[in-house]
From Swiss-Prot:
Pfam family, one: HLH
Classification lineage: Eukaryota, Metazoa, Chordata, Craniata, Vertebrata
SS bond partners: none
GO molecular function terms listed in the Swiss-Prot or TrEMBL record: aryl hydrocarbon receptor binding; cis-regulatory region sequence-specific DNA binding; DNA-binding transcription factor activity; DNA-binding transcription factor activity, RNA polymerase II-specific; protein heterodimerization activity; protein homodimerization activity; protein-containing complex binding; RNA polymerase II cis-regulatory region sequence-specific DNA binding
Name of the protein: Aryl hydrocarbon receptor nuclear translocator
Length: 800
């Protein structure tokens, strides 16, 4: 009832079965409502075509339906099983294919790894990515950067093959050689093997490289040339990186193209003659390379250490065929080593080999502002013999020659002015064995960059050998050697013994000249004797100047010894008195005329009497000529003088006209250094009488200027001479400078003194003395008053 209620459609569709099912007589195949529905639905199609009875057809349909379901189930399971098998087989096939592909890739990458030297040389097997990266790098290195041509010509277009070869070999200081890897036969060697190994090319051609190396190095050389398997090969040391490569023989690496070789061996050195030009440095390297090889024994071959670097290349090259008579022809493609051999400089040179070359000749020192050693290089022991501690704390001037001490001081002063520039000076240095060594010192100053103050002197002291044959180095422009005078330069260039002998000769000549002058002066009664006055009585010694720079003519206002004269002059010649150190000048020498020729002597020609224009016996004072305006003023002064006076007047300090405007000049002169005796006219020692134009000059010693203490007594004032002889010269003495006050008998105190009174405030073009005053130093007996000089106000003031 429930089934009928649940399936109303079924009951209405099948009315014949409805009551049976409803009455509780279900069929054997009916177990529930759901199954009945399904079977009823499936049976509907069968009922439409069944002509038999309803009951029999019902049981038959149930059996047929069950059998069909079983068949479908079994067929479905067979299909599923076959598809699973197919999938499994497909997966197996794919895995096998992938396995084979991976195996092939691994094999190819392994082969590529063996072909790349950088990969095969690694201690561990690299991964595939590393192998590919190294292979690409290796191919790039073989092919180059791309800037070179593909045919292998890597030389510039403007260089030939020979020029390129010579440039490479010259830069490498070695020789190029090519040897066969199989036999070791020398295929090629460059001609530079001669200066390197003293062997001609003929000794290498036709021989093997094994014949040229040391017997103990043959095995190592054979190992470097080998390209086959060798079970005895041990670890490989990379000389470039210093790392130990993996053990075993890498045949692929050793046979591959571009494999690098670098090894050190001992090669035989010949005895053939070599061009000295090419041996100058290589022979020195050969001597150094013998270190550690022991001394060369008589009769044994001479070996040197050679460093060979190169690459393994295919032989013969591509496109090159060997001749038929070549012993290696027909053997197929072989390999050869193309390398450059260079002399290996050892790290520990032998002292005996380098004793003659490394002998130090200079040392470096540092000094403070006073010149005291603050640092000394250890090479001073071999240069001057002193230990560094013996020089520290001492002044360098203490070790300098007395004649060169001032020169060294001046050089230090000039270095301070140069502010960092180098100045060289040469002086004599006292070594520890008490010998004088010529030392060239190149010094410069180190200044504090913040305060700009000089801190220390840094000097490089070089021992100059055979200094007597070498010219003195020219000092820089900062030291004006012309101001030092020829005497100082002459003394610095002469040895001590030569200088002493020269002074002795000059002293003897001084005594002879003094005796001759004293005898002739005693014989001169008056003015007439001056007509026979010869220049031979006061001959001047020729002075050989030290350099060409001293031969230039002196300017009009330039004295040979000026006020700021170098003080070393008095140190070298202490015998020169104060008056003899005065400044000298000549008014009769033009600006373009040379004072005297180098090394020339003055001929003893007698002087004409008209050269002596002075009214007294005192020779005229040679004075620098001023401008023409000053001469005209003095000429006007002389015209107002008394023309009837027969002799030169003698002035007293009370009646002498004083020029107050010239007092600053006197004050300036008094402040000068007493070392050179400027304005010191009281002493009787003076230069000998010379009034010849161009004659006055400086002498290297005191011989040319003898001391005559008794000359004043031989020249009494000539008061009886007539006025006709010297009418225009009698009153010109009124212009005497106020510096000469107190020197009334002036002609008795000095004769022929040649003065230069330089004033620092007055320019050099305006000297202080004039040409018209040549003869104003006569007998100054008469007195004058100021009324006799109405034009005195025209005299230009010198207050400035």
């Amino acid at each position: 009832m429930a089934a009928t209620t649940a399936n109303p459609e079924m009951t209405s569709d099948v009315p014949s079965l409805g009551p049976t099912i409803a009455s509780g007589n279900p069929g054997p195949g009916i177990q529930g409502g759901g199954a009945v529905v399904q079977r009823a639905i499936k049976r509907r199609s069968g009922l439409d075509f069944d002509d038999e009875g309803e009951v029999n057809s019902k049981f038959l349909r149930c059996d047929d339906e069950q059998m069909c379901n079983d068949k479908e189930r079994f067929a479905r399971s067979d299909d599923e099983q076959s598809s699973a098998d197919k999938e499994r087989l497909a997966r197996e096939n794919h895995s096998e294919i992938e396995r084979r592909r991976r195996n092939k890739m691994t094999a190819y990458i392994t082969e590529l790894s063996d072909m790349v030297p950088t990969c095969s040389a690694l201690a561990r097997k690299p991964d595939k990515l590393t192998i590919l990266r190294m292979a690409v790098s290796h191919m790039k290195s073989l092919r180059g950067t791309g800037n070179t041509s593909t045919d292998g010509s890597y030389k510039p277009s403007f260089l030939t093959d020979q020029e390129l070869k010579h440039l490479i070999l010259e830069a490498a200081d070695g020789f190029l050689f090519i040897v066969s890897c199989e036999t070791g036969r020398v295929v090629y060697v460059s001609d530079s093997v001669t200066p390197v190994l003293n062997q001609p090319q003929s000794e290498w051609f036709g021989s093997t490289l094994y014949d040229q190396v040391h017997p103990d190095d043959v095995d190592k050389l054979r190992e470097q040339l080998s390209t086959s398997e060798n079970a005895l090969t041990g670890r490989i040391l990379d000389l470039k990186t210093g790392t130990v490569k993996k053990e075993g023989q890498q045949s692929s690496m050793r046979m591959c193209m571009g494999s690098r070789r670098s090894f050190i061996c001992r090669m035989r050195c010949g005895t053939s003659s070599v061009d000295p030009v090419s041996m100058n440095r290589l022979s020195f390297l050969r001597n150094r390379c013998r270190n550690g090889l022991g001394s060369v024994k008589e009769g044994e071959p001479h070996f040197v250490v050679v460093h060979c670097t190169g690459y393994i290349k295919a032989w013969p090259p591509a496109g090159v065929s060997l001749p038929d008579d070549d012993p290696e022809a027909g053997q197929g493609s072989k390999f050869c080593l193309v390398a450059i051999g260079r002399l290996q400089v050892t790290s520990s040179p032998n002292c005996t080999d380098m004793s003659n070359i490394c002998q130090p000749t200079e040392f470096i020192s540092r000094h403070n502002i006073e010149g005291i050693f603050t640092f000394v290089d250890h090479r001073c022991v071999a240069t001057v013999g002193y230990q560094p501690q013996e020089l520290l704390g001492k002044n360098i001037v203490e070790f300098c020659h007395p004649e060169d001490q001032q020169l060294l001081r001046d050089s230090f002063q000039q270095v301070v002015k140069l502010k960092g520039q180098v100045l060289s000076v040469m002086f004599r240095f006292r070594a520890k064995n008490r010998e004088w060594l010529w030392m060239r010192t190149s010094s410069f100053t180190f200044q504090n960059p913040y305060s700009d103050e000089m801190s220390i002197f840094i000097c490089t002291n070089t021992n100059v050998k055979n200094s007597s044959q070498e010219p003195r180095p020219t000092l820089s422009n900062t030291i004006q050697r012309s101001q030092l005078g020829p005497t100082t330069n002459l003394s610095l260039e002469m040895g001590t013994g030569v200088l002493a002998s020269r002074q002795q000769q000059q002293q003897q000549q001084q005594q002879q000249q003094q005796q001759q002058q004293q005898t002739e002066l005693d014989m001169v009664p008056g003015r007439d004797g001056l007509a026979s006055y010869s220049h031979s009585q006061v001959s001047v010694q020729p002075v050989a100047t030290a350099g060409s720079e001293h031969s230039k003519p002196l300017e009009k206002s330039e004295g040979l010894f000026v006020q700021d004269r170098d003080p070393r002059f008095s140190e070298i010649y202490p015998n020169i008195s104060a008056d003899q150190s005065k400044g000298l000048s000549s008014s009769t020498v033009p600006a373009t005329q040379q004072l005297f020729s180098q090394g020339s002597s003055f001929p003893p020609n007698p002087r004409p009497a008209e050269n002596f224009r002075n009214s007294g016996l005192t020779p005229p004072v040679t004075i620098v000529q001023p401008s023409s305006s000053a001469g005209q003023i003095l000429a006007q002064i002389s015209r107002h003088s008394n023309l009837t006076q027969g002799s030169a007047p003698t002035w007293t300090s009370s009646t002498r006209p004083g020029f107050s405007a010239q007092l600053p000049t006197q004050a300036t002169a008094k402040t000068r250094s007493s070392q050179f005796g400027v304005n010191n006219f009281q002493t009787s020692s003076s230069f000998s009488a010379m009034s010849l134009p161009g004659a006055p000059t400086a002498s290297p010693s005191t011989a040319a200027y003898p001391t005559l203490p008794n000359r004043g007594s031989n020249f009494p004032p000539e008061t009886g001479q007539t006025t006709g002889q010297f009418q225009t010269r009698t009153a010109e003495g009124v212009g005497v400078w106020p510096q000469w006050q107190g020197q009334q008998p002036h002609h008795r105190s000095s004769s022929n003194e040649q003065h230069v009174q330089p004033t620092s405030a007055q320019p050099s073009s305006q000297p202080e003395v004039f040409q018209e005053m040549l003869s104003m130093l006569g007998d100054q007996s008469n007195t004058y008053n100021n009324e006799e000089f109405p034009d005195l106000t025209m005299f230009p003031p010198f207050s400035e």
